Amino acid sequence: MASSLTRNCSRFSKAISVRFMSNLPENTVYGGPKPQNPNQRVTLTHLRQKHRRGEPITVVTAYDYPSAVHLDTAGIDVCLVGDSASMVVHGHDTTLPISLDEMLVHCRAVARGAKRPLLVGDLPFGTYESSSSQAVDTAVRVLKEGGMDAIKLEGGSASRITAAKAIVEAGIAVIGHVGLTPQAISVLGGFRPQGRNIASAVKVVETAMALQEAGCFSVVLECVPPPVAAAATSALKIPTIGIGAGPFCSGQVLVYHDLLGMMQHPHHAKVTPKFCKQYANVGEVINKALMEYKEEVSKKVFPGPSHSPYKITASELDGFLTELQKLGFDKAASAAALAAENMEPSK
């Protein structure tokens, strides 16, 4: 009896030890498919905690693996795979042309590169407007096939509110988007700021409230006057994310290419929003590097010995030259011999 009790206690002690050594967080039931270190992976809980503490939430767009890695390294809270890829990656004048399949390619690339931020994927135009069931089906694909944690949809019409509610009820986190909604430029008459008169300003606040009621965990406020954004932020219990909406939102979002000053081409210069601060002129650095590369290749400066690392031993080279000559490739043998001589370090 005593021996059996000892064995049971030993097994229980080992189980407790394993549980304490587990990398699963204490407050979760299942580990999930991703590393669940609560000090690293950003979740809705982390965003809500930041919001309660009054700490601004940082959001930046990303569209591929390198940009996602940069966001991850910088400690950005939320990585948005935006349909703005239609403009800054694919070169279109609007966000309308990009397809769901194209968005999913961007989502998967970003998911491989950003391990810390909360990942949010835009629902592209034409993939959620017809019905709530279409919206849910699209949102499910963005999570299952794109590897996202949440989705974002634009607009505040009754059908959009219903769609947002249906997506949330399907178990998918949703960010709303009001103010300037680029997918609706046909109705808005272009990329025009909203909330600049009484009716429009009230509509911004009421629409944001309706999205909150539908279950959205956050709302993007785009291109509205700061007092309107401040009113919406004060009225809501969920965080607001501003873009061209002033400093009174719960957080801010900018497009990766815009804030880095990557696009120097006149096509993009004409659509770069004036509310965007450029924190770098990466485009100039890229242009300079490409021109320098072109010049060095043209002058046969690159690649030199230091960038030609793969060597062949003298004995193997001699044998290679002999074989070339046997095959009648005397000219090729001479070229190989001269190349070997030129690759020798200068004395």
UniProtKB/Swiss-Prot annotation:
Binding sites annotated in the UniProt record for Mg(2+)? 83, 122, 154
- Mind telling me which Pfam families this protein's record contains? Pantoate_transf
The coding gene here is: KPHMT1
A GO BP annotation: pantothenate biosynthetic process
Q: What is the lineage of its organism?
A: Eukaryota, Viridiplantae, Streptophyta, Embryophyta, Tracheophyta
Give one GO term, molecular function aspect: metal ion binding
* Protein name listed in UniProt: 3-methyl-2-oxobutanoate hydroxymethyltransferase 1, mitochondrial
**Highest taxon of source:** Eukaryota
Q: Tell me which species this is from.
A: Arabidopsis thaliana (Mouse-ear cress)
Transit peptide stretch: 1-48
Cofactor annotation remark: Binds 1 Mg(2+) ion per subunit.
